[in-house]
């Protein structure tokens, strides 16, 4: 039986209530162990290039785990446990904040959230 890594994604709205600012993610995606996967977060209502963006994840029944905060290629900070496997990036022309993941492990199974 082939095992899979389930990565669920949700819409994440900013903590500040501003109806014109939205972060949108696909509902769910699945990767295979040792495989790779790209998560995307479409942004609107603000200039993506002007802000730090963050990826966090949550394993069911546990708290949020910070993964990366990213402003630009010069200003990016990664959690040590994912530093060599995950890479964040911004496509400011298309307003997309992405997380490229490689060498997936079963412990990467979680809900992934982007946030500003």
Curated annotation (Swiss-Prot):
Residues 69-84 are annotated as: Complementarity-determining-2. Pfam families: V-set. SUPFAM superfamilies: Immunoglobulin. Residues 85-116 are annotated as: Framework-3. InterPro entries: Ig-like_dom, Ig-like_dom_sf, Ig-like_fold, Ig_V-set, IgHV. Residues 50-54 are annotated as: Complementarity-determining-1. GO terms for biological process: adaptive immune response. The keyword Signal applies. Residues 55-68 are annotated as: Framework-2. Residues 20-49 are annotated as: Framework-1. Transmembrane segments: none annotated. One of its GO terms (cellular component) is extracellular region. Residues 1-19 form the signal peptide. Disulfide bonds join 41-114. Keywords: Adaptive immunity, Disulfide bond, Immunity, Immunoglobulin, Signal. PANTHER family: IMMUNOGLOBULIN HEAVY CHAIN. This is Ig heavy chain V region. It comes from Heterodontus francisci. The lineage of its organism: Eukaryota, Metazoa, Chordata, Craniata, Vertebrata.
